Amino acid sequence: EVKLEESGGGLVQPGGSMKLSCVASGFTFSNYWMNWVRQSPEKGLEWVAEIRLKSHNYATHYAESVKGRFTISRDDSKSSVYLRMNNLRPEDTGIYYCTTGFAYWGQGTLVTVSA
């Protein structure tokens, strides 16, 4: 059974930082590109970031709205993917999901950016 479990969300003030984690099980994690996606009432579902495989030198790609503020990383030995978020803005509020190429999704973790 494939499982993706996100954690690390919560309430943070504008300009603050937060790190999300996602632990995977039930598949060979190191063989899959991983993504972070977020959902909000205002913007709906929005792709955030992608990290590829070791064979691709762990190449990363980002949505324009988060470029320079968010950093995706992975640890294949822990079957985990991370999202470091800096200089958070109210518009970053949403439920953040990790996905394996959009085939499998976690339950999500809520990030609220508010004073």
UniProtKB/Swiss-Prot annotation:
Disulfide bonds join C22-C98. GO terms for cellular component: extracellular region; immunoglobulin complex. Gene3D superfamilies: Immunoglobulins. Pfam families: V-set. One of its GO terms (molecular function) is antigen binding. GO terms for biological process: immunoglobulin mediated immune response. InterPro entries: Ig-like_dom, Ig-like_dom_sf, Ig-like_fold, Ig_sub, Ig_V-set, IgHV. Keywords: Adaptive immunity, Disulfide bond, Immunity, Immunoglobulin. Residues 1-114 form the Ig-like domain. This chain was isolated from a myeloma protein that binds inulin. This is Ig heavy chain V-III region W3082. It comes from Mus musculus (Mouse). The lineage of its organism: Eukaryota, Metazoa, Chordata, Craniata, Vertebrata.
